[in-house]
Swiss-Prot record:
Protein role: Component of the 26S proteasome, a multiprotein complex involved in the ATP-dependent degradation of ubiquitinated proteins. This complex plays a key role in the maintenance of protein homeostasis by removing misfolded or damaged proteins, which could impair cellular functions, and by removing proteins whose functions are no longer required. Therefore, the proteasome participates in numerous cellular processes, including cell cycle progression, apoptosis, or DNA damage repair.
Modified residues (N6-acetyllysine): 258
Protein name as annotated: 26S proteasome regulatory subunit 4
Membrane-topology annotation of the record: Lipid-anchor
Ranges annotated as biased composition (Basic and acidic residues): 14-26, 86-103
Residues with a covalently attached lipid (N-myristoyl glycine): 2
Subcellular location: Cytoplasm; Nucleus; Membrane
Biased composition (Gly residues): 1-13
Keywords for this protein: Acetylation, ATP-binding, Cytoplasm, Deafness, Intellectual disability, Isopeptide bond, Lipoprotein, Membrane, Myristate, Nucleotide-binding, Nucleus, Phosphoprotein, Proteasome, Ubl conjugation
Gene: PSMC1
Organismal lineage: Eukaryota, Metazoa, Chordata, Craniata, Vertebrata
GO biological process, any: proteasome-mediated ubiquitin-dependent protein catabolic process
UniProt keyword tRNA-binding present: no
Amino acid sequence: MGQSQSGGHGPGGGKKDDKDKKKKYEPPVPTRVGKKKKKTKGPDAASKLPLVTPHTQCRLKLLKLERIKDYLLMEEEFIRNQEQMKPLEEKQEEERSKVDDLRGTPMSVGTLEEIIDDNHAIVSTSVGSEHYVSILSFVDKDLLEPGCSVLLNHKVHAVIGVLMDDTDPLVTVMKVEKAPQETYADIGGLDNQIQEIKESVELPLTHPEYYEEMGIKPPKGVILYGPPGTGKTLLAKAVANQTSATFLRVVGSELIQKYLGDGPKLVRELFRVAEEHAPSIVFIDEIDAIGTKRYDSNSGGEREIQRTMLELLNQLDGFDSRGDVKVIMATNRIETLDPALIRPGRIDRKIEFPLPDEKTKKRIFQIHTSRMTLADDVTLDDLIMAKDDLSGADIKAICTEAGLMALRERRMKVTNEDFKKSKENVLYKKQEGTPEGLYL
């Protein structure tokens, strides 16, 4: 009995041993497998990518991006299928609109007739029709005034801009930028005509004080008249070469326009540009195209020509002074011009260009043969003393034809026979027949 009490363990002793075992220190579960790697330092650290261990959050992001990629692929496939199903005409229209957006749309030019309010106006186009249109908000309203040129949308004709320089392109072409090569030395004879045009056109522009001291007003314009080929246009070219003033050249037929009112408008633009670039000279060749005598006509074209001439009369001697703007006109038929056009006050000097006399013919022949290689037997006296009505243009044609005949026969010198044959050819073509004595 005593043995069992001293040597045996009771139930209370077993519980005590279990408590001692639980109190023992247990190390935490390591969170990283393997040894801790040392951080690399130095220049090689930037080139190495950091190690990313897979986590739950990264896995979710990857799945989300893959899902978005699938959606984008589905959308791309859907758009591709829709493009294939689209009709051919609709596809071409869309491509055409893209091309138009890239290269821009053209704009038409109109004239502002009247401003209704801040957002609306009445404009007219080149075809003569008027439109009630809107003014877009980005247009500078301070630049809008009746009569100015505006840019219009080609579909709705809305005002989308203002042209600052509203000069007609036809007037810009009329302005002579480069002076002609002809000078007074290239004109044979015509000494009196040269003196008169210098007194009427050049001196008032270069030395206006001479006329102020004399107490007279300089001539406003001159008209050059005479047979064809007598040097009227040549003298005008020499004036453009000698003077430093702006030279505007226009042919009378250019002032005849297709639409109603364009001819008078072109005349106004011509003189407005001349005043802006004063001192200037306006040369109107073949003035008889618009300056013929007025008469009652039922033709709309004839009435438009007469309105153009009336505008020219107003510009020559109207209410406003033209300043340093001189006018030179040229015509072959002065007897057909309207008396109001060539009266004093508008055209103060009428300069006649007759056919050349013997002295003038000799000078013209000398000018045109100065650069030609002539044979020893050439005597121009027979051509000069002839009673044929030769103009300066005819003499130039004779010299040119003689040179061509020598060139045809491979000769470098022009003989007297060449001049005789060339004269016969020129007279034959001029008279449109056979001259007398050709076959005698």
